[in-house]
A protein has these predicted regions:
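Short, cysteine-centered beta-strand-loop-beta hairpins and adjacent loop/turn segments enriched
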Residues: 63-64, 83-88, 153-159
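Small/polar-rich, solvent-exposed N-terminal microdomains that initiate assembly or binding
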Residues: 1-68, 161-166
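Extracellular/virion structural assembly segments
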Residues: 1-12, 67-73, 81-108
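Oligomerization/assembly interface segments of phage tail-like spikes and tubes
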Residues: 70-85, 140-153
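Acidic-leaning, charged glycine-interspersed low-complexity segments
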Residues: 18, 22-26, 49-51, 96-151
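A hydrophobic membrane-anchoring alpha-helix module
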Residues: 146-166
Length: 166
C-alpha cells in the first residue's frame, strides 16, 4: 500500500512568508522551528539578540475521523513574539499591535494557499484563532500564537498484506 500521504509543509510555508513579507522584514522578524511551547520558551531565552520571532512548532496535535470520507486532521501551531522594555505596558501594546498586523498579513496569503491546497485535496479549516499570551508568560516579550487545522484524506481500506495471518 502506498504510504505517501498528501501533506502541507507549514514550516516551509511560514519560513517563506517571513522572508518575503515586507512588514516582517521591516520589523526584524526572524524565523525558527521549535518543538511545542517548551521549545518556544527555549528559543526566547537563547536568542537574546533577536527582537521578533515567528516560530513554527514541528509537533502537531491531530486525530483520524472514521467517517464516510476518512481523513486525518493535524493542527499546527505558529508562535509570534516581539521583545519590549520590561514593565513598559505601552511598548507591550505596540508590540501586540505589530503581532496582530503580521497575523492579518499572513492570513491574506493563507487564503491563496488554501485555494491551491484544495486542488490537492488538502483542506485548511477556515476558523483560525489568534490567541494573545498573558503579559507574564515571558517578561519583556509580547507573545501570541495561532493554530491551523489541516485535513487530508486517509486511506483506511483493509489491506491483508499489512497483517500476519491470524
Amino acid at each position: 500500500m502506498n504510504l505517501k500521504l498528501s501533506s502541507w509543509n507549514a514550516t516551509a510555508f511560514f519560513q517563506d512568508l517571513v522572508a518575503r513579507n515586507k512588514f516582517a522584514t521591516a520589523q526584524g522578524f526572524s524565523f525558527c522551528r521549535v518543538s511545542g511551547l517548551e521549545g518556544f520558551e527555549e528559543a526566547l531565552q537563547t536568542m537574546q539578540s533577536t527582537t521578533a520571532f515567528v516560530c513554527v512548532s514541528d509537533m502537531s496535535q491531530g486525530y483520524i475521523a472514521l467517517a464516510n470520507t476518512p481523513r486525518t486532521r493535524r493542527v499546527k501551531t505558529i508562535f509570534l513574539a516581539m521583545r519590549h522594555a520590561i514593565d513598559d505596558m505601552e511598548a507591550r501594546l505596540s508590540c501586540m499591535e505589530t503581532l496582530r498586523e503580521l497575523f492579518r498579513q499572513f492570513m491574506s496569503q493563507l487564503i491563496l494557499e488554501r485555494t491551491r491546497l484544495e486542488q490537492s485535496c488538502i483542506y485548511l479549516d477556515e476558523r483560525i484563532t489568534f490567541n494573545e499570551m498573558n503579559e507574564y508568560f515571558f517578561s519583556g516579550c509580547a507573545c501570541a500564537y495561532f493554530q491551523i487545522a489541516v485535513d487530508t484524506f486517509t486511506d483506511l481500506r483493509y489491506n491483508a498484506d499489512e497483517w500476519n495471518n491470524e
